[in-house]
Every structure is written in structure tokens, then in C-alpha cells.
Regions:
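Catalytic-loop region of hydrolases
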Residues: 2-83, 90, 97, 420, ...
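A catalytic-pocket lid/entrance helix-loop region that shapes and gates access to the active site
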Residues: 146-264, 690-808
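Alpha/beta-hydrolase fold nucleophile elbow
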Residues: 119-131, 664-675
Length: 1011
């Protein structure tokens, strides 16, 4: 009779028994199964699904036995193997219960049933596994600690991730760490491939050399074709790293980093042939023959195979889990420093999910699944369970998604240097590195401790780190004492119109990440004529002395007692309505100079309410914008002082000084702000509640997020909802045409001529960043229109008509030009005729024919502009720094099929962070996490007495607060309204939704004022 005292439960998690922990749990990737026959045999022929494997503690790991609920078993064999017959299909309906939550419950049920069957009163179960099985072991241990005494996990990606860009970067870093010259040769070979793929003759060379099937000239050459090519190619570089020196299959003695580097360092071989040799070597490693093989090069075939419910095998099953809860998609979304640029954005994998499982399996479904996973198992890199031993194999690219610290001293993490994917769980080998042997010894030691019940803390090597805490405590005590000892000047000269007037030859800088200026909102809303009239009125108020400017001495650093540098921060005030009640309305400045308009125009809601309630109106300029410059220049070392925490401390010191200077004893300050200043108004109430009584946060994106694809997703949704009937198709038609033109020299050159670019793009290779930023300019046009759309959506519909006209124009051009030879006079005349008309439509003038009047557009020009570190030169340098250093908000098109194609990968923005400031994606991600930990983000905002107001059309609304934690916090989403609409007074043109929200906001404001 089977009655074990100690049981080890190995979690193989739905993969073939033949390959135990390592083989079948490969990350999703078509190429590896296409070229390793022994894997393909497992997927296609055996069709054997194994959920869990039971091993006796004293055994030498016999073949595992499958466990399944409600399956009869004998005393001699716990559970028999269950073969999945060909009639069982992996349909979406059948896959509905394939998820980690069900798997954890299966483990629970299995253990309970075995305990019951064995009659043991004190069984000691140890759960262990590698890769996803390791994650299950850790999750089960967290969820049901009473059913096991410990867990062992190796190479366990326990943290769900929408975009696992770090996998590929870890691969590249591994080659560089092994041998710099190997890495340099790899970089050279990759560069050659990226150059060749841009031209017809280059693609033919790639097709012939790498035996692509089908060849590029047989494909329609849409973005997914190029992306899939790179997915295939990268797999041959990834697996030598993932399985480096792992005692499994062919990798036990070959196929590692050293073997690939040997091929790369053969300088007698040309770059492309080095790539071919690596592909040939890896295929041969799996028993194949490259000379008789064809490299798959057809995205349509891939998704067709995976969509076949009876054919996709385990890859279809695990893809299901990736698309629904785990993510784990390996991309090149790292930014500068990655060898493959933006070749595989997360867009590719989201499209795969939709194409394989259906349109409902989109980015929203994936995002919700990843969020649920993090909510269930934890989003922190700190493991909170007890009695767990986690092995991080430091060559394994998956290590980044594993836990790196523990919160309980009975758990430990061992960083196995030089070790790769689940190496410690494989049979011992002479090829094992020292750390693998050590890992096995430590595992044995831990298991003995768990079995003996020796849980004293001294028995463990602890990596204890406390969880990050969300805070809402008053921050006054953290500002250094000298900051409060300040001076204020109430009589500074008012500036003239401060906005920079660009020189006619200044290159176009895209409004990257949509730097906000409330003046732009007003101009769009009310029109230039009314705006100019209002400016005259505001100037008259300033002339009569109601509106004045002042300054306050502020510390450059409010938190470093060793830094005594100070600067002048400017503010403006309007005391026209001040009735002496000590009520103050503070308009917080943001990423633009302050302007008397915001405290002087009666079209601004705060001004109207200030007049009604007798408030003093103040406006405080944000450090590093306008005249408030803390440092001599905008160099990166100085930009560290440009931070929201420093800005909030500025405001706190300012409020305190005003209270003292005006002898306020019972002041009541209410903060206002829109967009980023809206976030500041919410955060200042969170951090300094004793100084700020309440806040109104308009269009406030309080959630920091690196890849903010929801921005462009909202632009698309708003275009669908409020644009013309054909707007979606017209916009998509333009970008599809533009992407197609970029695939050939003639197409690129034709576009450059049509649009009047100085660079004619007439070479086989162009910098992909030039094309990316050029097309991005058109994305920004429609995005900016949506962000600042009017209530009737006439601005958006006008922009839609513009795209419709451009499409018609380009269609006529393409039709006419197809009947002429490239070098004929007739051809040149048609190009000139159409380029003249098109440039009139785009720029309002003709910018071709004269070199001095062409359009100076390139990525390098943009970098040169943004690298200028002279104050007053550009607010863009400061704002983009804030996004790289705190906020993220990269407005990518990484949300699956969309009207913009894959025009703006997240690297579009990550490259700027690196190329302008030297900050890579790891830096950006870490600082985004810090921002959310500091302020709580949208889900854990703990402030009180705040009103959040957003418009459903506004692309920034997804980052605001909608489920407040405190009943004193209100949230309004105004249907059909866009950015900061609520900050203006009501007019006849306003919709019912806007009027209703305005009344509700004013009611809350009145309660604060009269309390």
C-alpha cells in the first residue's frame, strides 16, 4: 500500500513527460519546434499532457505519472497516464479552464485526495518545479502554506509581464559578458541584416542565403512579415544562451554561447554568412540538415497553424496562457542599446493573440489578465511566502521575471552565477558549473530542514527586504529647515509674452508625449479672435494693478542639507476679488511658463469661482520652466533637481511663506491644475494635507507608466466614436501606404520628394529612426487634434477630411505615376505637380525645388535640438526629461491592430531617453515604479478631498483615478469631452455632460469653501 511519509511533488504543468522540466516549457516561439525534430515529435505525435508528477523521496526520479481530478486510481499506481485523443481539440471553449488559478487548485485537490487515500496524519509535501512549474510551486506555497512544508523553484518567471523586453536584452548582454569581440561581431552581423532588409536586392540576398520559405519577394511585405522574420532569426541566438551548458538534450555538450561565439569570431567569413552558419549549426544540433531545410518566413502560416485547434499542440496551449494571464512576450522594446532596434514590438504578439484566438483576445484582455495575475500572486520582486528556496540562474534570460528578494527569513534566494535555464534540476554532469552543484547541495539542505521542522531563522540565509509601502503622511517634516527660512518679493515686473518664437529655419520637433499648455486648449476651444480679446482684458487688469508678479527664494534641493544653492521662483497673483476671508485658489504651474491669463481671464473657471467666493488667486511657476530656473544650464546633472517631489516642496514652502507674510491664521488653500499640474494638485494634497485643504485635478494622469499605449488606443477609439464615417479607414489607408513605401528605395525617395524633405532617401539604407519620426509626425497630428478637440468634434472631423483628401491625392498620384518610366520628363512633371499640391495641404506652402526651402527632417536634427542645455531654449528638453525620469508615458502604438500600423514602437521614446540623457529602459522602468510607489498611482491614491475630472475623449484619461479609496474623493468622466474641458466656464456650446459635471464640481467646491 502506498503510504509515504515524505512526498516531493514535481510540477510539470501541462508538458510532455519525455522532456521533464526543461524541454517542452520553452517560451513560445515557432522556430525552435520547426527545427528540432525531437521536440516536434513530442508536440505533434505523442500529444501527451502531463499536469503533475509524483516522485518518492528515495527514488531516482522515475517517469512521472499524470494527475487529473476524478480519475480512478489503484493502490499500486496513484494515477495512470492519460492520453489526449485526437478527438480532443484545444478549442477556445476547451481552453477556458487552462490557467494558473485552476492549476493551483488542482494541486490543492490532488494533495488533499492523496492525504485522504494514504491515511497519513502528518504528510510532508514538497512542491518543486522549473520555469512555469516553478512559478506554480511558489504560488501554491503562498496560497496554501498548510498543505506543503516547502517549495523549490528554478528559473521561475513568477511575475506576469505584458512586455518581456528584458529577455532579448539579457541574451545580448550574455554574449557581451562572455566575449566583447564576439558581441561586436554579432552587432556587425545584425547591422548587416538590418541594412539588407530595407531594399529589394538586399531582401533577395537574405532569402537566398538563409533559405527563407517563402522568399521575401513572394510576400506582401506588411509589418508582420518583417517582424516574424526577426522572431525566427532571434531564436537561433536565444536558445544558446537560455540552455548554455544545461545538461539537457544536445545542449549538455554543445550549442552554447561559446559555440556561437566561435562562429561569430571567424573573421574569414562575411557577416551574413556568419548568421547563416549559426542557423545551420543550430538546426544540425537538433538533427536537421540546413542544406535540405527551409527557414519559415510566413506569418500567415504561423497563425494558421496555431489557430488550428487540433494542430497547435502545446505551443497553442501555452500561447493561450500568455495571451490571457502571463504575457511573457519576448520583444525588442528595450530601446537604444538593443542590437535589433524596434524589429519586434509587443504589437506583434498582441496581433498573434487576436489572429489565433479571435478579436476579443486583444490588448485589453491581456492587460486585464496580467493585472489579475499580479493582484493574485503579487507584483513585487519580493517573494512573501515561507519555506521556499528559489534558484535564479544568472545566465538564464528568464531570471528577470523571477523574485530577487524574500520578505520571510525562512525563504531564500540563490543566485547561481554562470548557470542557465533550470540547470540545477537536470541530472548531474561533468559540464556543470560550480554554482549548479552548490544549488543542488543547498536544495538538499533546505529540504532536510523543512522535513525536520527546523524553522529557526539562523538556519537560513535570508535576503530580507521589506515591501515598499504606499505613503500619505505629511511631508513637511522631510523638507530641510533652511527651506522654510525664505524671502518673498511681491513686486516683480510682469513678463511680456514669454513663449518662444521659433526661427523660420528651426527644425520641426514633434510634440513628443504631448507637452501640455492650457493656452493651447483655450485657443482651440474659443478661437484666436476671442483669445486675443481676452489677452487685452487681462493686460488691462495688470495695468490697473490687480494682477502682479512676484518671486520667492527657494532652495534648489529641499531635501539635501549639504546643498545650499537657491534660486528665484516666480509667481503671479490677482487680488481683485480677495475679500479677506483667507481663501486662496492656487493654480499650479506645469511644463510651460505661467501666464496672467490663467488668473485674469474670466473664461477660466477658477477665476470665475474666485470672484464668486472672494478668493485670492495665485499661480506658481514650475521650476525649470519659464523664468524659474534653478541652475545655470539644463545639463543632466542639473536636471536631477527637476522632479515632482522638488516641485511639490516648492509649493509647500511658498504656501507657508504666503501664510506668514499675509498674517493668515485660518487659511484655506484649494489647488487647481490640469494635465501634469492636475497630478501635482492631487499629489500636493496627498503629501501636504496640512497646507492644502482640497484640490481639483483636471485631466490628471497620476499613474506613471512606461509604455502608455492606451494614449494612442484612446485616440483611435475617439476617432471611431467622433470622427467622420470613413475616418478610421482613411487614416489607416494613409499609414498602410506610407509603411509600404518605406520598403523600397524608390518608394522612400518618392515620399521624400512628395513631402519636400531635404534628405531624399535615395540609398539602399536609411536610419530607421528618420522614417519612424517622419511618420510619427502624422500620428501626432491626429493625436493632438483628439486631445484638444472641441465639444462638437468639428476639429477632429476636419482632420478626418484632411486624411481623406490626402488619400485621394496619393491614390491619383500612384495611378498616374505607374504609367511612366522613372527617368522620363513626364514622370518628373507628375511628381512636381503632385508634390506641389500635397505640400500645400501639409505645410501650407511648397517646400521643394529649392534646397534652402526643403523640410529639414531627421532624427539627428531632433537630437541636436533636444541636447541643447541652455535655459529658455526649449521646454521640450525639460518635459521629456521628466517623462524619462519619473512618468514614462511613452505614447506607443503597441496595442495590436490599429489605424497607425506599428508606426510608434515604445522604442520611439526609449531611444530619446538614452540618446539625449543617457538613460536606458531599465532606468525608466525603475523610476516609473518609484513614482507609483511614492504617490500610489491610480489604484492606491490615498489623498482626501480631491476631485478628479476627465473627458472620455481625452487620451490621458486612462491614467487617472476612477475608484477612489476615500469617500471624500470624487471622480467624474465627462462623456464626449476632451482634455481639461472643465477648466473653462460654461458656455452655450457646452454639452449636457459638461454642464452636469461643472455643476457637480462647483457643488463640492462650495462645500469646501463654506465648511
Amino acid at each position: 500500500m502506498w503510504s509515504p511519509r515524505i512526498v516531493a511533488l514535481c510540477l510539470l504543468a501541462a508538458f510532455g513527460t519525455q522532456y521533464a522540466l526543461a524541454s517542452a516549457e520553452l517560451p513560445f516561439g515557432f522556430p525552435i519546434t520547426a527545427h528540432f525534430p525531437f521536440l516536434l515529435d513530442s508536440y505533434e505525435n505523442k500529444r501527451e499532457y502531463v499536469s503533475y508528477s509524483i516522485f518518492r523521496a528515495s527514488s531516482a526520479c522515475p517517469l512521472p505519472m499524470t494527475a487529473a481530478k476524478n480519475t480512478s486510481h489503484s493502490q499500486s499506481t496513484i494515477l495512470q497516464k492519460q492520453q489526449i485523443t485526437s478527438s480532443s481539440t484545444a478549442s477556445v471553449t476547451n481552453l477556458a479552464t487552462l490557467n494558473s488559478y485552476q492549476a493551483v487548485e488542482d494541486i490543492k485537490y490532488f494533495i488533499q485526495q492523496q492525504n485522504k487515500a494514504s491515511g497519513e496524519t502528518n504528510p510532508k509535501w514538497i512542491v518543486y518545479g522549473g520555469y512555469y512549474g516553478g512559478s506554480l510551486a511558489l504560488w501554491f506555497r503562498q496560497q496554501y502554506p498548510g498543505l506543503s512544508v516547502g517549495a523549490v523553484a528554478s528559473s521561475a518567471p513568477a511575475l506576469a509581464a505584458l512586455d518581456f523586453y528584458r529577455y532579448q536584452k539579457n541574451v545580448e548582454d550574455a554574449y557581451q559578458a562572455y566575449d566583447q569581440s564576439c558581441y561586436n561581431n554579432l552587432a556587425s552581423a545584425v547591422t548587416e541584416v538590418r541594412h539588407l532588409i530595407q531594399s529589394v536586392k538586399g531582401r533577395k540576398k537574405l532569402s537566398d542565403t538563409l533559405r527563407l520559405s517563402p522568399a521575401f519577394d513572394k510576400l506582401s511585405l506588411v509589418e508582420s512579415d518583417f517582424q516574424f522574420f526577426y522572431v525566427v532569426l532571434l531564436s537561433f541566438l536565444q536558445y544558446p544562451v537560455q540552455f548554455n551548458k544545461v545538461n539537457w538534450g544536445p545542449f549538455s555538450t554543445s550549442g552554447g554561447i561559446a559555440d556561437v561565439c566561435k562562429l561569430l569570431k571567424d573573421n574569414s567569413v562575411k557577416d551574413l554568412d556568419k548568421v547563416k552558419n549559426i542557423v545551420s549549426y543550430m538546426i544540425g544540433l537538433g538533427g536537421g540538415d540546413f542544406s535540405n531545410s527551409n527557414l519559415p518566413n510566413n506569418y500567415t502560416q504561423l497563425v494558421g497553424w496555431l489557430a488550428d485547434e487540433s494542430n497547435g499542440g502545446q505551443m497553442r496551449n501555452f500561447l493561450w496562457q500568455q495571451c490571457n494571464e502571463l504575457g511573457f512576450f519576448t520583444t525588442t522594446d528595450y530601446g537604444s542599446g538593443g542590437l535589433f532596434g524596434s524589429s519586434i514590438p509587443n504589437n506583434f504578439w498582441i496581433n498573434v493573440c487576436e489572429d489565433v484566438f479571435g478579436k476579443s483576445f486583444d490588448v485589453d484582455n491581456l492587460k486585464a489578465g496580467v493585472k489579475k495575475s499580479k493582484s493574485t500572486y503579487g507584483a513585487s520582486s519580493t517573494y512573501t511566502g515561507k519555506n521556499a528556496f528559489i534558484v535564479r540562474n544568472m545566465v538564464d534570460p528568464w531570471r528577470t521575471l523571477g523574485h530577487i528578494t524574500v520578505s520571510d527569513p525562512t525563504s531564500s534566494i540563490y543566485n547561481a552565477s554562470g548557470s542557465a535555464f533550470t540547470a540545477d534540476l537536470q541530472p548531474p554532469s561533468n559540464n556543470d558549473v560550480v554554482s549548479v552543484k552548490m544549488a543542488r547541495n543547498l536544495i538538499n539542505r533546505r529540504i532536510k530542514q523543512w522535513i525536520s521542522g527546523s524553522n529557526n531563522k539562523r538556519a537560513y540565509e535570508s535576503n530580507h527586504i521589506a515591501e515598499e509601502k504606499k505613503t500619505s503622511k505629511d511631508m513637511q517634516g522631510e523638507i530641510k529647515a533652511s527651506s522654510w527660512e525664505t524671502e518673498i518679493n511681491w513686486h516683480e515686473k510682469l513678463p511680456t509674452e514669454f513663449e518662444k518664437v521659433p526661427h523660420p529655419k528651426t527644425p520641426y520637433i514633434p510634440n513628443i508625449k504631448k507637452r501640455h499648455n492650457l493656452l493651447d486648449v483655450f485657443k482651440h476651444k474659443m478661437g484666436d479672435e476671442l483669445y486675443q480679446k481676452e489677452r487685452v482684458k487681462v493686460s488691462e487688469k495688470a495695468g490697473s494693478g490687480f494682477i502682479r508678479s512676484g518671486s520667492i527664494k527657494q532652495n534648489v534641493d529641499h531635501f539635501d542639507s549639504k546643498n545650499n544653492d537657491v534660486y528665484r521662483q516666480f509667481f503671479m497673483l490677482n487680488d481683485q476679488y480677495d475679500d479677506g476671508s483667507q481663501l486662496v485658489f492656487l493654480m499650479i504651474g506645469g511644463e510651460a511658463p505661467i501666464d496672467p491669463f490663467f488668473i485674469g481671464s474670466e473664461y477660466i473657471a477658477m477665476v470665475q469661482w474666485g470672484a464668486e467666493y472672494g478668493a485670492l488667486l495665485l499661480e506658481l511657476e514650475h521650476r525649470f520652466y519659464g523664468r524659474s530656473q534653478p541652475t545655470e544650464d539644463l545639463s543632466v546633472p542639473n536636471l536631477k533637481y527637476l522632479h515632482s517631489e522638488q516641485a511639490l516642496a516648492d509649493a509647500a514652502v511658498f504656501i507657508n511663506k504666503v501664510n506668514k507674510d499675509r498674517n493668515y491664521t485660518t487659511p484655506r488653500w484649494i489647488a487647481f491644475g490640469g494635465s501634469y499640474p492636475g497630478s501635482l494638485s492631487a499629489w500636493i494634497r496627498l503629501k501636504y494635507p496640512s497646507l492644502i485643504y482640497a484640490s481639483i485635478a483636471s485631466s490628471a494622469p497620476v499613474q506613471a507608466k512606461t509604455d502608455y499605449f492606451e494614449y494612442m488606443q484612446t485616440v483611435q477609439n475617439s476617432t471611431r466614436a467622433f470622427g467622420t464615417k470613413t475616418c478610421m479607414s482613411d487614416v489607416h489607408k494613409f499609414f498602410a501606404w506610407a509603411q509600404q513605401q518605406m520598403t523600397t528605395v524608390a518608394g522612400r525617395n518618392g515620399m521624400a520628394t512628395l513631402f519636400g524633405l531635404c534628405n531624399k532617401w535615395d540609398t539602399d539604407y536609411i536610419d530607421p529612426k528618420d522614417a519612424e519620426f517622419f511618420l510619427g509626425m502624422f500620428v501626432y497630428q491626429i493625436a493632438g487634434t483628439v486631445q484638444y478637440d472641441d465639444e462638437g468634434h468639428s476639429r477632429l472631423q476636419k482632420r478626418c477630411k484632411w486624411f481623406e483628401q490626402v488619400d485621394q491625392y496619393l491614390g491619383a498620384y500612384t495611378k498616374q505615376i505607374s504609367f511612366t518610366g522613372d527617368d522620363t520628363e513626364e514622370h518628373q512633371q507628375i511628381v512636381k505637380q503632385f508634390s506641389t499640391g500635397l505640400q500645400q495641404m501639409l505645410w501650407g506652402s511648397v517646400r521643394a525645388g529649392d534646397e534652402d526651402d526643403c523640410f529639414p527632417f531627421s532624427y539627428q536634427i531632433i537630437l541636436d535640438e533636444l541636447r541643447q542645455d541652455t535655459p529658455y531654449y526649449t521646454d521640450e528638453r525639460c518635459w521629456i526629461w521628466q517623462t524619462c525620469n519619473e512618468l514614462g508615458v511613452a505614447q506607443s502604438t503597441n496595442f495590436g491592430y490599429n489605424i497607425f500600423e506599428s508606426t510608434l514602437p515604445v522604442n520611439h521614446f526609449m531611444d530619446l531617453c538614452y540618446d539625449v540623457y543617457g538613460k536606458d529602459r531599465d532606468y525608466v522602468d525603475a523610476h516609473v515604479r518609484a513614482t507609483n510607489a511614492d504617490y500610489g498611482g491610480q489604484d492606491y491614491y490615498n489623498g482626501t478631498q480631491v476631485v478628479f475630472v476627465n473627458g472620455s475623449e481625452d487620451p490621458w484619461n486612462p491614467l487617472s483615478v476612477y475608484n477612489p479609496k476615500d469617500k471624500s474623493v470624487s471622480s467624474f468622466l465627462i462623456d464626449g469631452s476632451s482634455h481639461c474641458e472643465d477648466m473653462f466656464i460654461l458656455g452655450d456650446y457646452d454639452t449636457k455632460a459638461v454642464k452636469k459635471a461643472h455643476r457637480a464640481i462647483k457643488k463640492i467646491l462650495k462645500s469646501w469653501v463654506s465648511a
